Amino acid sequence: MDEKEREILEETKNQEELESQDFDLEDILKEFSDEPPAAEAEEPEESFEEEQEEEDAQPAVTGDTIRLDKLDTARLETVPMDETRRIEIEEVTPVDKEAEYDQQASFVNSRPIVFLPRSRLRELKRKLIAGPEKRYYDLSEQGVGRLQIAIVLSILVVLLSAGATALYELGMVPENRMKLMVFGQFFAMLVSALLGVYQLLDGLVDLTRKRFTLNTLLVVTLIVCCIDGVFCLDALRIPCCAAFSLQVTMSLLGEYHKRTIEMGQMDTMRKATRLHSLARTPDYYEGRPGILRGEGEVEDFMDNYEKLSGPEKLTCVYAVLALLASVGLGVAGGVLHDTQTGFQVAAVTLLAAAPASFFVTNSRPLAILEKRLHRISTVLCGWKGVKALSGRVAFPLAHRDLFPAGAVKMNGVKFYGTRDPDIVVEYATSLITMGGGGLVSLFESLLASRNGLKYPVENFRHYALGGIGGEIDGEPVLVGTMSFLKDMGVEIPEGIRVNQAVYVAVDGELCGLFALTYEKQAGVASGMSTLCAYRSIKSVMTDSDFMLTESFIRSKFGVNTRRMAFPEETVRQELRDKELTEHSVVGALTTKQNLESMAYAVTGARCLRTACRLGTGMHVFAGVVGIVMMAVLTVLGRMDLLTPANMFLYELVWLIPGWLITEWTRSV
């Protein structure tokens, strides 16, 4: 007999012994209890009998209840380990409720819209780190120190070249030093080109992008001037080094502006915890497009800030035409005179076609504006955003824009008549809450401090005179300014001269006066001033606040309210209900939702557009004038007037108005 058969026989005997035994509940509990056995205390027979009666009196056991003392012995049988149970799992396909409800045409999305500020902030930070912050650190590694040193050295080259040119024109250079003078000027021109080598490389890179910019034209100018300089060494003629060095200096200055602008914009974006957008929406008020506010996206800025502006595109077209004109005049000079004269004419024509200030006409106005926008945490979304914020627009204003939280305070309360003061407060709060506006929270706090209640208002209406009215418990109630109550026939006691106060009248009798203090903040005042300074901007009051009348705003902020609009209540309600559409164009992003940031974005954009367009137009005109002058002198053969001194003076003459135009954005 094997060992396995012996083990099977022993297990069978043990199983039969277990089946033959009867187990009580107490035995089972004792078997599985961890507590040590305690000494059994003698109990009287009466208590045992009472427990026996209570046990017999237990309620009937329901079908879903199992009594341990009634366990069937068959349940205690052990299941062989080698027995395998098969369990079939049926896969349940989820029901597409939305599709089912759509077929029945009775689906209603009952799931609530959950606002997850943390997830939005996390997504915003992820985009900011991948875009603006990464770009900011790349620019920080490049820095602006080398550019500043190059600009200073280039200015020194300009001064030395201009001084040497002046000595030559005054006849203070001896003939035996002429070759040294010419070689020195030619060497200075090469040094200037070395200082602006990155600008020249940018001009070549622009060709690969299918752009012919001023830097590309500067590369051609360098090549032609170098060839002309070789002829100058043979003819002992001074090359136009001063004019070329001045152009290189201004090109370096333009690159410095572009880098500081981008660093400032990226710094503003990377510090954002929330972005607010200013977008242009068509047909907002009286046919004017409106500048509405909404949630901003990082892509609104990153996708547009590097795109060429309208003036820059015009500059590229002009640069190509200027090159063709210069080549044509050079060929004409070579045909009419000789090869040396042809290169001389081409060189001076290229210099005259692009005045030095042309290189900063688009960058410097934005650099000046960016310093102010950076302080108020605002960025413009490229030239597309500048165009969106320009033109004749309507700018909506609300109570929170003029008086942010905490700017309006209760200065005092005075009651008149025999009516209960708590009733007066309750009536006033009920009416103001129905009307809405910036005074709701203030009066609700006053009502809560008095443990008051709100009453239902009937026949509520707004009055154009500066107040609201309605019926509460069958009594007519008026709330508004002092002039409003006087116009409504309410008698005001003599001696009351509080203008900034809310007056309450019940049944034609003055019952209360709530004096208010409106704090004028510097940022709000500057924002209102810049908005009202432009005729093309119409500031529209959209809030239902009877205190914000035209006379009150004029006296409080000292602005020209004739450029503001105070529409009827029905129109204000329609304006408040308007939202951004798919046709809205984002013009600017700001991290602070205050009036100063939004107002300067709008007015700054239109100043920038004016400065860039005016500057580009003026420099194109100056270049055309220079090309025409070179053509006339070439035809007349007056090569004696094409001197380096005259070319440098020509650059300086157009530098003054061009520089002044770039200051336009300081007037914002």
Set out the residue ranges of the language-model regions.
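Core alpha-helical transmembrane segments of integral membrane proteins
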Residues: 145-202, 631-647
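Signature of the cytosolic headpiece of P-type E1-E2 ATPases
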Residues: 148, 181, 231, 449-552
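Asp-based phosphoryl-transfer active-site loop
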Residues: 385-413
